[in-house]
A protein has these predicted regions:
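Extended, well-folded interaction surfaces typified by the phenylalanyl-tRNA synthetase beta subunit core
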Residues: 2-13, 19-37, 41-44, 48-102, ...
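TRNA-recognition modules of translation machinery and tRNA-sensing kinases, especially anticodon-binding
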Residues: 68-70, 101-280, 290, 386-492
């Protein structure tokens, strides 16, 4: 779970009130957080939520707490300045790292707390939400050192030389990957391609080599920097825009002014970022009643939602009606009405719900499948294999194209939030191969297995599909062959 460092006085100034440690511990329940350590005025706060990157900095925590302790409720509103800066996107970068979004923050007064939180948020979001920069990487620059317009393109390994941040001399992209510490750490993200992403300004100076490193010239942000450029690159625009919005909001909460940026692709299509769009949503009042154990009044429902940073459009008068609401697009975690009701419960306070004894008791036991699975795991671990656990959601490319197989009929998601998670897996082998491909830098031999659920179409089933348990084993090494793998199966 993400753990962030926070200066208590900084948090109090952002919220607009003071806290004792006990009061703060209680208030952090609104963000699924708890104090993990105290050293003077420095706090370590653990956020027990891996799907709320907007809470992984002090500004995000303060944004939620302000809604509980002031009239500043509902979806936060941010004024934006119309764009002047343009980033042109070359066709060359499309197959390497296709998505980019950017924002300008003007007139920001940077102190030690802001600089510390900015760096921390950048690392937490890119590291966790961005899957160690694979899905999302963030660059923050001193705008006054950049000559517009910018070009996001791709270059060869011996392309434009530049001095990377904390570097000692100018280097080619290949040298950055071979010599610079960040280049060594993240080279695996780009070295499978014959060209590397790069951002160049109007003076033909390199601004950044995403997702690896910024340039020393414009990428060093200090307390003297007044105008910042934030750029986010990645594989899916939805994730890129979410990360950008979070950082832009955080700096706006510090007094900065948000200015949009034009993103122009090779076909002259223009996207303006950031945009603080909202989505409409409906929640059944019956679900609220069933979850709470009672039906809150319409006034209470509206108050709980606004304190949870939702806009309430309307509340139907009848108990079998709906609540019509809006939520910001950076809340990617909202996929079901229960996600909204959970926020309402946190705002109400779980401790305020009166417990009731169950009306009847039952005695449970392990299912036969669970007993079997435990035995299988014991056997596999006994052979020296390490168990892995991958997602049941995947995509057709992993299941078929990468396995050199024709497409087959499988269970697909009607409205996937990401093309990476658009189908249900029908077998486990691709998951093992994918993991091995991402761990080529780990010592060999590698022995892994997975025992997990798969899904196949079944027209005779009431839901049209059927779940089943499957197991797969894989071993990689210089002396591995089929005979060796067969002996593992004979362990049964």
């Amino acid at each position: 779970m993400p753990t962030i460092d926070v200066h208590k006085q900084d948090l109090e100034e952002l919220v607009g009130r003071k806290f004792t440690i006990e009061e703060l511990e209680e208030s952090l329940k609104f963000v699924k957080g708890e104090i993990d350590g105290v050293s003077g005025h420095e706090l370590k706060i653990e956020i027990k939520s891996t799907d709320r990157p907007d809470l992984w900095n002090v500004e995000g925590i303060a944004r939620v707490l302000r809604a509980h302790y002031s009239k500043n409720q509902g979806i936060p509103k941010y004024n934006v300045i119309k764009p002047e800066l343009t980033i042109n996107v070359s066709e060359k970068v499309k197959k390497v790292r296709p998505c980019i979004a950017a924002a300008i923050i003007r007139d920001i007064k940077i102190d030690d707390d802001i600089l510390k939180q900015l760096i921390q948020a950048q690392e937490k979001i890119a590291g966790t939400f961005g899957r160690r920069r694979r899905e999302v990487a963030i660059g923050i620059f001193n705008l006054d050192k950049i000559v517009p317009p910018l070009l996001y393109t791709a270059t060869k390994s011996d392309g434009l030389k530049f001095e990377p941040l904390d570097g000692e001399r100018k280097m080619t992209p290949a040298e950055v990957l071979e010599i610079h510490p960040k280049g060594k750490e993240f080279a695996h993200l780009v070295n499978s391609h014959d060209v590397y992403p790069i951002i160049i300004d109007g003076a033909n100076d390199v601004v950044s080599m995403p997702p690896i490193i910024n340039s020393e010239k414009s990428g060093r942000v200090t307390k003297r920097s007044k105008n910042l450029l934030i750029e986010v690159t990645g594989l899916e625009m939805r994730n890129v825009e979410t990360a950008l919005n979070i950082l832009a909001m955080s700096l706006a909460d510090r007094g900065g002014k948000i200015e949009q940026v034009n993103i122009v692709d090779s076909r002259d299509n223009i996207i303006v970022t950031p945009t603080f769009a909202v989505k409409d949503f409906k929640v059944d009042k019956y679900l609220i009643k069933r979850t709470f154990g009672f039906m809150p009044s319409d006034k209470e429902i509206k108050s709980l939602l606004e304190r949870s940073r939702y806009n309430v459009v309307s509340v139907d008068k009848t108990d079998d009606g709906h609540v019509h609401l809006q939520f910001p697009t950076y809340r990617q975690d909202i996929m079901h009405a229960m996600d909204v009701v959970e926020d309402m419960l946190m705002a109400y306070g779980f401790d305020n719900i009166e417990p009731h004894y169950p009306e009847f008791f039952t005695q449970g036991e392990l299912k036969p499948a669970t007993v079997r699975n435990r035995k299988l795991r014991e056997i596999m671990v006994g052979t020296g294999a390490q168990e892995i656990s991958t997602f049941i959601l995947t995509n057709k490319k992993n299941l078929f194209e990468k396995m050199n197989l024709p497409d087959d009929e499988i269970v697909e998601i009607a409205n996937p939030v990401s093309s990476n998670w658009s189908v249900m897996r029908s077998w486990l082998t691709p998951s093992l191969v994918e993991l091995l491909s991402k761990n080529t830098n780990v010592e060999y031999p590698q022995k892994i297995f997975e025992l997990g659920q798969c899904v196949k179409l079944n027209t005779r089933s009431q839901v049209g599909s059927e779940e089943m348990w499957k197991m797969a084993y894989s071993e990689a090494g210089s002396k591995v062959n089929f005979t060796h793998a067969k002996t593992i199966l004979q362990a049964y």
